[in-house]
């Protein structure tokens, strides 16, 4: 198996004055076509099922889109913000998920300015529940990082 990398942006979207967290994958690294995936995470807490069957990426819904710079907030707002109305607040954290040949997973949480990073790992051979829990914890940490930063761009 080859190593696979995925990038996710976790923004905060406001609809009717309620805050929701959504995970929007932007590109699969090394792909000129800019494949992405969409999975839901409300307020940074992932559903335990999270649409991830036997491997962490197999259950993601893939869709084709143009590659986009990860840290371009104006482009981010243009691409995703208007799908949810005009009350978009802020992009929050970027999460990189890497699936390694030994079946281990690495999750890196980047701040939106790209200046700081935290890493969480899940060893090869871990049960699916542990992989899901690790990603859930990464999303919760991302949500905590969001709360510490200014709301508006």
Residue ranges and their predicted role:
Residues 46-94:
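Negatively charged, low-complexity tracts enriched in Asp/Glu with abundant Ser/Thr
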Residues 2-36, 98-133, 137, 141-146:
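Intrinsically disordered, low-complexity regulatory segments enriched in Ser/Thr/Pro
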Residues 149-153:
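Short acidic DE-rich linear segments
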């Amino acid at each position: 198996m080859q190593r696979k990398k995925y990038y996710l942006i976790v923004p905060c979207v406001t609809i009717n004055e309620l805050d929701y967290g959504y995970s929007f994958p932007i590109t699969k690294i090394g792909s000129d076509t800019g494949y992405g995936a969409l999975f839901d995470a409300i307020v940074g807490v992932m559903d335990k099922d999270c649409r991830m069957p036997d491997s962490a990426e197999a259950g993601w819904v893939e869709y084709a889109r143009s590659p986009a710079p990860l840290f371009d907030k104006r482009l981010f707002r243009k691409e995703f913000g208007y799908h949810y109305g005009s009350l978009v607040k802020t992009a929050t954290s970027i999460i990189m998920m890497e699936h390694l040949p030994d079946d281990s997973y690495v999750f890196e949480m980047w701040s939106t300015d790209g200046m700081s990073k935290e890493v969480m790992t899940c060893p090869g051979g871990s049960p699916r529940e542990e992989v899901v829990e690790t990603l859930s914890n990464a999303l919760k940490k991302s949500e905590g990082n969001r709360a510490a930063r200014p709301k508006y761009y």
